[in-house]
């Protein structure tokens, strides 16, 4: 499995896509205030901007490529001027190709200003949320859209609450093992194509399915399996953090595999270190049970800082020390 890929980022999204999708996974509803061609306007930056200085006439450093937020301060500034001055101030904003304007806290735009925005082709929206909350939710949505992401071949399963990514060469039985885990009560996130995202500088990796493949699986000799239809809603997950990578390997008698678990391996995915467990495959080995133990070991270390190999090593060391003391006394 090649995890050395740097990942990809979207360069931009249309304002139409932004308007249609932001309310799906975020608690914010935008109301359209004018009718313009939203496909022609694009958002290319995750940061937002409050154009107070631009409205006042200082546009030298105006970051017009960002979504423009008009809150209480900006709307009151406009309302405190007569119509001619309002138009002049608002012209400083709409003469640039801004992606869109969002009014927060149920603020309203004067009809003549809304007409100016429409003539300039600038979409205008309104939300009941305060500027602080609206900016938080919009930034979170744009963070997700412009996050580093990459597709990987494998299976992603929620095992005992731990996100486990199964990888390995094609034909080793990743899907079959994932199906076995599902039958044992765990949840499928994605099979065959796993999309992994990293938001900004976060060290958390999110895994999700390909929308076309959804929660279908291909099992050799059987065909396509609809996990949701066969096992019910409990057997699927929409998204899960990648917490452990389990790499399935072909058994090789000459290879020296880890036996104690003292040598903890890791692998970099999109610049984030993730614990790696390598499991050799051979007939008769119950991989599903072993993966459950991998997940439980992760939880033990995460919550209790307990590692079985270290505990056993300490017991042996203590026993040897006691034996040496008894020899010295005799």
Curated annotation (Swiss-Prot):
Enzyme Commission number, as recorded: 2.7.11.-, 2.7.4.-
InterPro entries given in the database record: HPr(Ser)_kin/Pase, Hpr_kin/Pase_C, Hpr_kin/Pase_Hpr_N, P-loop_NTPase, Ser_kin/Pase_Hpr-like_N_sf
HAMAP family: HPr_kinase
Summary of the function given for this chain in its UniProt record: Catalyzes the ATP- as well as the pyrophosphate-dependent phosphorylation of a specific serine residue in HPr, a phosphocarrier protein of the phosphoenolpyruvate-dependent sugar phosphotransferase system (PTS). HprK/P also catalyzes the pyrophosphate-producing, inorganic phosphate-dependent dephosphorylation (phosphorolysis) of seryl-phosphorylated HPr (P-Ser-HPr).
Additional facts recorded: Both phosphorylation and phosphorolysis are carried out by the same active site and suggest a common mechanism for both reactions.
Residues annotated to bind ATP: 168-175
One example of a Gene Ontology biological process annotation: regulation of carbohydrate metabolic process
Entry's family note: Belongs to the HPrK/P family.
Protein name: HPr kinase/phosphorylase
Annotated catalytic residues: 153, 174, 192 (proton acceptor), 259
Pfam families referenced in this protein's UniProt entry, alphabetically: Hpr_kinase_C, Hpr_kinase_N
Reactions the enzyme catalyzes: [HPr protein]-L-serine + ATP = [HPr protein]-O-phospho-L-serine + ADP + H(+); [HPr protein]-O-phospho-L-serine + phosphate + H(+) = [HPr protein]-L-serine + diphosphate
Positions of region (Important for the catalytic mechanism of both phosphorylation and dephosphorylation): 217-226
Cofactor(s) demanded: Mg(2+)
Transmembrane portions of the chain: none
């Amino acid at each position: 499995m090649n995890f050395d890929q740097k990942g990809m980022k979207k360069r931009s999204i249309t304002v139409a896509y932004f308007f249609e999708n932001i309310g799906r996974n975020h608690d914010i509803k935008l109301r359209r205030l004018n009718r313009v061609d939203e496909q022609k306007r694009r958002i290319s930056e995750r940061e937002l901007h409050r154009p107070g200085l631009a409205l006042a006439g200082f546009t030298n450093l105006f970051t017009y490529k960002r979504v423009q937020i008009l809150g209480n301060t900006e709307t009151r500034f406009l309302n405190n001027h007569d119509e001619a001055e309002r138009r002049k101030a608002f012209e400083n904003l709409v003469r640039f190709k801004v992606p869109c304007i969002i009014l927060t806290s149920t603020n309203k735009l004067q009809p003549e200003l809304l007409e100016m925005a429409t003539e300039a082709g600038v979409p205008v929206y309104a939300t009941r949320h305060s500027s602080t909350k609206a900016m938080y939710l919009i930034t979170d949505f744009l963070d997700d859209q412009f996050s580093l992401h990459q597709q990987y071949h494998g299976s992603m399963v929620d095992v005992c609450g731990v996100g486990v990514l199964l990888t390995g060469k094609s034909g080793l039985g990743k899907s079959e093992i994932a199906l076995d885990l599902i039958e044992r009560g765990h949840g499928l996130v994605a099979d065959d194509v796993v999309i992994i995202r990293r938001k900004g500088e976060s060290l958390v990796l999110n895994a999700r399915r390909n929308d076309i493949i959804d929660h279908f699986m291909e099992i050799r000799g059987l065909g396509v399996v609809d996990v949701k239809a066969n096992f019910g809603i409990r057997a699927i997950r929409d998204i899960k953090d990648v917490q452990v990578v389990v790499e399935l390997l072909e058994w090789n008698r000459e290879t020296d595999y880890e036996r104690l678990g003292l040598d903890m391996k890791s692998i970099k995915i999109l610049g984030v270190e993730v614990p790696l467990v390598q499991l050799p495959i051979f007939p008769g080995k119950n991989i599903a049970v072993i993966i459950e133990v991998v997940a439980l070991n992760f939880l033990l270390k995460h919550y209790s800082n307990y590692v079985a190999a270290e505990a056993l090593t300490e017991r042996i060391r203590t026993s040897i020390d006691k034996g040496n003391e008894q020899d010295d006394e005799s």
